[in-house]
Amino acid sequence: MPSKGKDKKKGKSKGKDTKKLIKTDESVVDRAKANASLWEARLEVTELSRIKYRDTSRILAKSNEDLKKKQCKMEKDIMSVLSYLKKQDQEKDNMIEKLKQQLNETKEKAQEEKDKLEQKYTRQINELEGQFHQKAKEIGMIHTELKAVRQFQKRKIQVERELDDLKENLRNTERIHQETLRRLESRFFEEKHRLEQEAEKKIIMLAERAHHEAIVQLNDAGRNVFKENDYLQKALAYHLKETDALQKNSQKLQESHTLLLHQKEINDLLVKEKIMQLVQQRSQIQTLQKKVVNLETALSYMTKEFESEVLKLQQHAMIENQAGQVEIDKLQHLLQMKDREMNRVKKLAKNILDERTEVERFFLDALHQVKQQILISRKHYKQIAQAAFNLKMRAACTGRTEYPKIRTFDGREHSTNSVNQDLLEAEKWTHIEGNVDIGDLTWEQKEKVLRLLFAKMNGCPSRKYNQSSRPPVPDYVVSDSGETKEFGDESKLQDKIFITQQIAISDSSGEVVLPTIPKEPQESDTGTF
């Protein structure tokens, strides 16, 4: 019997649990429906705000497109004005260059009358340069104004960029705000769900405990009252939670509404500022256009005046050029006469030089012959002196005589007894009086005589020869060893004695003609010396 009572109690408790589960499922469904209706209302509100923002963005895009079209038109007009002004400047520069070229040509043609005409042309050129500087200043003013327009355009672009940056910042802030809201909402719902689960678990635990205690203590009527009280408490807690959530959502919506109103006010202010700036820009562009028109009229008037002055100057220059051309023809005729006279003088000078070159060749051949004789005689003297020295040394070796003084034959500088000292004695003019026959002189003295004759014939001052110096020998003379030797600077200076090697004659064609003198003198008969 007690086992049957226990089974009945267990069946009753299971039925009660199923009823409670059904009730909790119904409450969850009701909550889900309430949440769905709430989110639908939110979605409708956001859709309405999105439609409004779309309309405003379309209106702003249209206004931006209109402003861009106007800006492009204004830029095209400004570029056309700039190109027209640049073309006019280029044409003026070309005209100025042509006039300068014409002036240079007139100066080249009239070289001799340059001093007379220079004063007139300088005055006229100064006047033209003054006008040109004035025009350049005016053009510079135009350029400065155009630069101001360009700076204004650049400033406009910068302001537009700043607007775009502000819009992007606003969008970023909105996006960040929405993300933070989403995060907070997700956290809130997670915490809410977790707390609800914990509360439900605790309530279930408490309810089970209370239920068991109530079942034990109360009768049927008390049990019904307890159940109703429990149900009412749950409903009240649920409604309180819903009211808290609705209050929080209403606060968030109010905050977002205030933010949107603030952004709208900022956008309205920015649009008003841009409209004011566009109005100012239009007024400035109109004033600049008026200035450009006035400057164009002034430039056209000044160009006409400049062209008329240029025509007058060209006519005056043509008349003066014709007069100068007549005088140039006369001078050219005189120059031709002078050229003929110069050609005659050149022919005479050439004939004289040809005759002189023959004499110089004769002297060169004589000098060459004398130098060769000097070399031969010196070589022969060295051989005889060396043979005599060798004989004395042999005799001294046998003991018949004493040893002679040491003598050198290679011409060393520090030698005290050299053969070259005997050779230098031949150059000295000792024991020679007036009316000397040239056949009685040595070969070295004959060479000096020939050089003095050359110097006197060419009008050059006679040079003093150092008696201790080596006798001059030309570069082409062969020494004892069969090799060519270069002797000092006198062999180079002797080539500068001759007049035919110093004077260059130019004929009428402008080419330089030098007399042909051979470097190596030809052998001639020098029997007279």
From Swiss-Prot:
GO terms for cellular component: axoneme; ciliary basal body; sperm flagellum. Keywords: Cell projection, Cilium, Coiled coil, Cytoplasm, Cytoskeleton, Flagellum. It is found in: Cytoplasm, Cytoskeleton, Cilium basal body; Cytoplasm, Cytoskeleton, Flagellum axoneme. Residues 1-22 are annotated as: Disordered. The keyword Cytoplasm applies. One of its GO terms (biological process) is motile cilium assembly. Residues 85-201, 271-361 form a coiled coil. The keyword Coiled coil applies. Plays an essential role in sperm motility and male fertility by stabilizing the sperm flagellar axonemal structure. May be required for the stability of ODF2 and MANS1 proteins. Dispensable for the assembly and function of motile cilia. Interacts with MNS1 and ODF2. This is Basal body-orientation factor 1. The lineage of its organism: Eukaryota, Metazoa, Chordata, Craniata, Vertebrata.
